[in-house]
């Protein structure tokens, strides 16, 4: 497994783009993905979750994930990455837990969730406070639709996975080998 840690330089990343294969990676941002055309496979840990038009996937901070596209047709999605601090009252959940099943099907999603996502995607200027408000609308509507489990329950027992997860979650802390 080739894994990368992506340092998110921008406070907010929001774009609609053609979906493609993205190798396993992790970052300390909350990632929201909404399929707008075609299909997308979102891999979290060792599980692969199929997503269709209108489905929304959530990757909480410091969770190894990847994307795959198997369809021959063009697939597009809205991708939003924000610091977990943007989650407001949901911040502790974003940092300490992960969705057991990270995809919410289109039929379960209220229209204001799509409106909030589109508002973020269509912003001409980066307005963090406005983005934060929209992210909290999305979370308020969606987080109750997901069963949350401790992050240690998501992923793999594989030594490499566990090592990378530990290092990524603790690399800023001081430590000693004494």
Please state what every model-predicted region is.
Residues 1-56, 71:
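Generic protein-terminus/edge-of-domain signal
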Residues 1-16, 57, 61-126, 136-148:
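A hydrophobic/aromatic-rich effector-binding and dimerization subdomain
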Residues 31, 108, 130, 162, ...:
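Amphipathic alpha-helical recognition patches that constitute DNA-binding helices
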Residues 36, 114-125, 164, 168-171:
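Regular secondary-structure segments
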Residues 40, 65, 173:
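Glycine-centered loop/turn positions within well-structured domains
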Residues 109, 123-131, 152, 156, ...:
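Residue-level recognition of alpha-helical structural elements
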Residues 151-177:
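A short, Lys/Arg-enriched amphipathic alpha-helix from helix-turn-helix/homeodomain DNA-binding modules
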């Amino acid at each position: 497994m080739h894994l990368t840690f992506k340092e998110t330089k921008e406070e907010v990343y929001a774009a609609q783009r053609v979906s493609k294969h993205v190798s396993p990676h992790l970052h300390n941002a909350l990632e929201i993905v909404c399929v707008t055309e075609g299909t997308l496979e979102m891999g979290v840990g060792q599980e692969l979750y199929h997503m269709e038009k209108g489905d929304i996937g959530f990757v909480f901070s410091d969770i190894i994930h990847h994307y795959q596209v198997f369809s021959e047709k063009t697939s597009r999605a809205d991708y939003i990455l924000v610091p977990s601090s943007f989650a407001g009252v949901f911040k502790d959940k974003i940092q300490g837990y992960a969705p057991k099943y990270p995809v919410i099907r289109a039929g379960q999603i209220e229209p204001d969730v799509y409106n909030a996502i589109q508002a973020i995607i269509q912003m001409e200027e980066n307005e963090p406070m406005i983005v934060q408000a929209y992210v909290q609308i999305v979370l308020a509507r969606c987080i109750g639709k997901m069963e949350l489990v401790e992050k240690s329950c998501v992923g793999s027992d594989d030594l490499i996975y566990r090592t990378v997860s530990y290092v990524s979650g603790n690399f800023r802390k001081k430590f000693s080998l004494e």
